[in-house]
């Protein structure tokens, strides 16, 4: 049944986006303030078609940026409470050069200072993990983070939706075509159906579609949220059971891999970044042979054992996905109130790693509770004000290749 723009809904909070960020925010808001009238809108409720639906689900907590470390730690604490969708299998960073090994030692020291357990593994300890890596990699250096793990983003998202619904949050499948303003204040949203829904607070948890939505609202400043395409491949299903293994990252090669249960997955950032200027209805793009095939070939060559299920030619296993996610000029989320626009809030460019932590922080900001002001300042959506859109886009795209170098 359509929701009309009547008096009953003028004081409600609308969240656009029902991925893990929007759904977890709806839960935390409804838990902290049961009287809050919350509506979550998404063009697809039954299917999760945003980045949440395609994210590999790596959850590494240590980051060279303290704010992201804290948000990741907070997120893991929340995910473990759900008893579903998160497995603490640990995370490995592997290096094969002296420089890479030195970097691992540096990250070990820094992670310990941050209060996160980590240790370097010797060759014998690596072998005991029974990783699906080629023999030539058996002697590589490895840094192990035992408290890291892997998430099933869609499972986590569904759990938060369910808990939010139990708290009275409403989820409606609808496509938002614009933001309605009165002066410098948000008063509602306009749907593609022509309806207008009133609200006093509006949260954009719109991920890769943020820029395109803001382009339709000339009264709202643009933000440097740049959608990019990313290759991820799945191996053939295994014909035998194996013990769960830690997720693996090779920072020197910009490659990562994880065990998905019946098969392995591999992704790589070792290619020129590709801006997706007009995202479609899902967070995917057609696979680009000329760009992705060479990168994936480099990623799997001499890296995995034969029983990992990969092949050295397309489709490299069983399935290839051209995923889409957002980058920003400093590889940090945009979270908080939008300056100069009363009632508008933003929660975008957020990975599963930090989603619950970001949602809890925004809930505190919106309800005027005590919150970490230093982290909020780091994530302020207006922190790039004064710089040109062209410069910010170029800077954001440059961040793509550094995602799994040292800032993991």
Which residue ranges define each predicted feature?
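Beta1/beta-strand and adjacent pyrophosphate-binding region of the FAD-binding site
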Residues: 6-21, 39
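Glycine-rich FAD pyrophosphate-binding loop
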Residues: 30-52
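Dinucleotide-binding Rossmann-like beta1-alpha1 core, especially the glycine-rich loop
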Residues: 56-129, 254-257, 295
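Flavin (FAD/FMN) cofactor-binding and adjacent substrate-gating region
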Residues: 81-83, 97-168, 172-173, 178-185
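Conserved beta-strand-loop-beta-strand element in the redox core of flavoprotein oxidoreductases
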Residues: 178-197, 202
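Central helical "cap/lid" subdomain
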Residues: 194-246
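Active-site lid/adjacent beta-loop-alpha segment flanking the redox-cofactor pocket in flavoenzymes
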Residues: 221-223, 237-343
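C-terminal catalytic lobe of FAD-dependent flavoproteins
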Residues: 298-408
């Amino acid at each position: 049944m359509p929701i009309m723009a009547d008096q009953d809904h003028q004081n409600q909070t609308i969240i656009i986006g029902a991925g893990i960020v929007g759904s977890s925010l709806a839960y935390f808001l409804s838990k902290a303030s049961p009287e809050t009238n919350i509506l979550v809108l998404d063009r697809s409720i039954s299917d999760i078609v945003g980045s949440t639906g395609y994210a590999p689900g790596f959850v590494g907590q240590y980051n060279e940026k303290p704010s992201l470390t804290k948000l990741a730690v907070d997120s893991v604490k929340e995910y473990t409470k759900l008893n579903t969708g998160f497995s603490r299998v640990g995370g490995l960073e592997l290096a094969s050069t002296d420089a890479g090994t030195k970097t691992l030692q540096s990250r070990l020291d820094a992670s310990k200072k941050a209060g996160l357990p980590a240790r370097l593994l010797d060759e014998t300890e690596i072998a005991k993990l029974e990783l699906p890596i080629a023999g030539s990699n058996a002697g590589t250096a490895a840094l192990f983070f035992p408290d890291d793990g892997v998430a099933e983003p869609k499972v986590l998202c569904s759990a938060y939706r369910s808990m939010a619904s139990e708290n009275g949050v409403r989820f409606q499948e609808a496509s938002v075509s614009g933001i309605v303003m009165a002066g410098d204040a948000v008063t509602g949203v306009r749907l593609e159906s022509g309806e207008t829904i009133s609200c006093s607070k509006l949260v954009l948890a719109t991920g890769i579609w943020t820029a395109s939505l803001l382009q339709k609202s000339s009264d709202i400043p643009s933000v440097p949220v740049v959608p990019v395409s990313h290759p991820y491949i799945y191996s053939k299903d295994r014909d035998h059971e194996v013990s769960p293994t830690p997720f693996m990252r090779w920072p020197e090669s910009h490659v990562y891999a994880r065990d998905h249960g019946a098969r392995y997955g591999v992704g790589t950032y070792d290619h020129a970044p590709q801006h997706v200027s007009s995202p479609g209805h899902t967070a995917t793009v057609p696979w680009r042979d000329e760009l992705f095939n060479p990168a994936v070939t480099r990623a799997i060559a001499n890296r995995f054992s034969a029983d990992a299920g990969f092949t050295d030619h397309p489709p490299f296993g069983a399935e290839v996905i051209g995923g889409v996610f957002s980058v920003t000029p400093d590889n940090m989320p945009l979270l908080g109130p939008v300056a100069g626009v009363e009632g508008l809030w933003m929660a975008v460019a957020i990975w599963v790693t930090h989603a619950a932590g970001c949602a809890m922080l925004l809930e505190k900001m919106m309800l005027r509770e005590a919150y970490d002001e230093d982290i909020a300042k780091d994530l302020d959506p207006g922190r790039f004000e004064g710089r040109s859109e062209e410069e910010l886009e170029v800077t954001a795209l440059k961040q793509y290749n550094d995602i799994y170098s040292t800032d993991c």
